[in-house]
Amino acid sequence: MTELDEVDSLRSDGDSWTVTESVGATALGVAAARAVETAGANPLIRDEFAPILVSSAGPAWARLADPDIGWLDDDPHGQRLHRLGCDYQAVRTHFFDEYFAAAAGAGIEQAVILAAGLDCRAYRLNWPPEAVVFEIDQPKVLEYKAQILESHGVTAAATRHGVAVDLREDWPAALLRAGFDRDRPTAWLAEGLLPYLPGDAQDRLFEMITDLSAPRSRIAVESFTMNLTGNKQRWNRMRDRLGLDINVEALTYREPGRADAAEWLANHGWQVYSVSNREEMARLGRPVPEDLVDEAITTTLLRASLEISR
C-alpha cells in the first residue's frame, strides 16, 4: 500500500458512500472515539449507542472502539496519540451537546444536524417534549444507523426525521418536504463537516442556512485548521494494525482562499462566539500534552445566533 501522504484525492463530483467506505467510514471512526470516552472512568459525554453502531460494522471496527486501546499495546506513543484524538472528540461532542441544551433552554425546539453520520443526539439528549430533530446525510448512512438502533430496541428521544440527501444537492427542498418549518427558530449543527465540502459548497451551505433561519436561530460549527502530522500517523496505524483505511486527507478539500466560517457568519448577521479546541480541552481537563502539541489537531469551535430577520 502507498503511504497516506502519497495518496491523491479520493473525491469526485456526486460521489456517494456507505457507512464503511469513503466519508462514511470517518463517522465510524468518530463513533468509536465516543465509545472509548463513554467507557472511561470520568466521561465528558455518554453515548451508549456508539459501541453498538461501531461493533455492528465488523470486528476490526469493534477493536477500534476498545476503551483500553489494546490494538496499540506495544506502541506507547501511538496509544497516547490515539487517546489524544479520542479526548478531542469527547471535548467537541461535549461542546455541541451543551449548545443543544442551551438552545432547548431558550425555547428552540427545532434542530437540524447536517451530515449527521452516526450522531445519536436525537436518541441520547434530553429534548423538550415538542422537539423535532432533522438528520441530513447520505441515504445508506442514515439507513444503517436507523436499522441498527431499531434492531436493538432503541427509540429516539425526540421526533426524528431522516433526510436522505447529499449536501451538495438541493437539500433545503428535501428538508422542507420532510416538515421543516422555516418560521420557527432552529438550532443548526455542522460538526466534522466543512473539510468534506469544496469551498464554494461551504459558502452555499451557509447561505442556505441563513435563508432558512428565522430570527433567534442558532448555529454551531467546527472549523478546521487541519494538522496532518499526527493524523497521518493515526490513520497509518489504523490501516496497518486493523486494516481500516480511513484516509481523511484524501477525502477532504484543502483549497486556498476558503472562507473563514466565523468571519462569514459575522458578516451575514450572526453574532459569533468561538473558542480554540485547545482552550476548550484545557478547560475540561483534557489538555494537549506539551510533547504532542505538534501532532495535535487544531480546530475552532463556534456557536452563533441570528438576531435579524432574513
Curated annotation (Swiss-Prot):
Stated name of the protein: Putative S-adenosyl-L-methionine-dependent methyltransferase MMAR_0356
Enzyme class: transferase
Molecular functions per Gene Ontology: methyltransferase activity
Protein role: Exhibits S-adenosyl-L-methionine-dependent methyltransferase activity.
Residues that bind S-adenosyl-L-methionine: 137, 166-167
Keyword Transferase attributed: yes
UniProtKB keywords: Methyltransferase, S-adenosyl-L-methionine, Transferase
